Amino acid sequence: MSAHRQLRLGTILHGASGNMSAWRHPAAIADASINFDFVKETALKAEEGKLDFLFVADGLYINEKSIPHFLNRFEPLTVLSALASITSRLGLVGTLSTSYSEPFTTARQFASLDHLSNGRAGWNVVTSPLEGSAKNFSREKHPEHALRYRIADEYLDVVKGLWDSWEEDAFIRNKESGQFFDPAKLHPLNHHGDFFQVAGPLNIGRTPQGRPVVFQAGASDDGKKLAAKHADAIFTHHDTFEEAKAFYRDVKQQLETNGRRASDLHIFQGISVIVGNDAEDVENQYQTTAALVSINDALNYLGRYFEHHDFSQYPLDEPFPDIGDLGKNSFRSTTDEIKRNARERNLTLRQVALEAASPRPRFSGTPEEVADGLQAWFEGYAADGFIIQGGTPDTFPRFVDQVVPVLQARGLFRTDYPGTTLRDSLGLEQPKNTFTQQ
């Protein structure tokens, strides 16, 4: 392992963790998605383990078939602002959609979070996959996939430009002279594009990190292109080492075409983990959680990926139905993978639904075995880091207490935070102000 390359770790607040029915688990906090004591405990545990960040996902549409913890959960920026006051080094990353918000407001919100946290804010950029989102924002139609990414591209140009409105030392605040700021260090944006007309400047100063860290979630071609141009990190998910390695290579090559270095963007694989004493213990933990998922729950979960399609209309024990292009305008990369996997393995609808709703954790075993898996993917250049989700409701504390020390002993993961900001933790350079380079 290169002395200059360190494994990165984050965790996700995802209800009770485990699968969609894990809130029923004996060890679960049933209202975890709206329980701030649980949220606080998770954040403090992550910081105890020296993790890079805690990530709060989000969505803008629900119905009666939605995943239970999606029905009642905190808005990301609100809960992250609360966590800023009780943590000191942990990065705070939240999702916000470019399809259903305005760049000025987004730039202001994440700049505020970066100031509140002394430089620990991160924005996970999504374009919103669920078509029902349009109904909650006075829209007649959800934008098509390609259009959403064109909007996101310009949106990010605007937000980053607004974050550069003020130079770092623009606010003089000289009481004797009465000069509050230096006008020469204020830069209106005056953006006129295809989708946005934004004058600027932003009404909050340059942030402790220069700019909050930009994450992008998605594995489609459009998503990879957007990340290679704009992002500091990308969230993705692949089932095999070979798929993850191919994705890693592709994104890193696209960075070069954008004049960026491979080290300018970290690739995080989202993984589920079970830590146990031995193989029998791990299997018992998995089966206990998997048994909580009914076939109806599984069909509803699967349908969410396919624009809330009703899969209950098909025979359960016949081959996965031909549903054409359904899913191409929602979770495109995920639905393509589900259909391909079902076809190649000749899976029934029942098998596809249960595998989707209660997948086996990618990395499971003793602490040493889990660490072995993470190390193999990291050193094999299939990932720069991982977003840890517990395969059971009580897995994450075990991961911090038992797996992190193994990674630290192997020199893969740090034993303390290297600085105070999220960029410090991730080893990312502070971006220069684009206006001062002109």
Q: Residue spans of the language-model regions?
A:
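Conserved, mostly hydrophobic/aromatic
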Residues: 9, 46, 50, 83, ...
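Hydrophobic faces of well-ordered beta-strands that scaffold small-molecule active sites
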Residues: 7-11, 54-56, 90-96, 119-125, ...
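An alpha-helical appendage that flanks or caps ligand/catalytic pockets
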Residues: 2-17, 146-209, 242-249, 253-376, ...
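Active-site mouth loops of central-metabolism enzymes
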Residues: 22-37, 95-104, 140-142, 208-221, ...
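Hydrophobic or amphipathic alpha-helical targeting/insertion segments
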Residues: 86-87, 91-137, 143-146, 151-155
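N-terminal beta1-alpha1-beta2 module of alpha/beta enzyme domains
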Residues: 1-86, 209-212, 326, 420, ...
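Acidic (Asp/Glu)-rich catalytic clusters
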Residues: 2-4, 47-48, 80-88, 114-120, ...
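Alpha-helix-loop-beta-strand connector modules within alpha/beta enzyme cores
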Residues: 67-93, 257-258, 397-415
